[in-house]
Amino acid sequence: MKYMLSVHTCEGDVRPAMSAEEMQQSWQQITALESEMKSAGAWVFSARLHEPETATVVRVSNGEVLTTDGPFAEAREHLGGFYVINAQDLDAALGWAAKVTRCIGEPIEVRPFAGTSED
């Protein structure tokens, strides 16, 4: 079954400044985790996203398509990135989410894809 692991970040949260060496170690941990996911057949896709200010919302109103600069909702928390994974069940997906949050230090929301029971 496919799951989305959403990486949530909080605008304005001050994270400790990382030295170049610490940043390199962090990327090595993420790379190692993604390699582990790939070896286990869990990794499908992952991506980081730009800040919410770079978003554009497209919607229909009275039959007309409108675009608005900025995020869909003004909120302190926003989607910073995501993983799409294959996992046997929720417990397995939660196990991967635990590894991701340990690696990056951000909360992870785990949700199954609708309409699929395997893949």
Regions found by a protein language model. Name each.
Residues 1-119:
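Conserved, structured core segments of small domains
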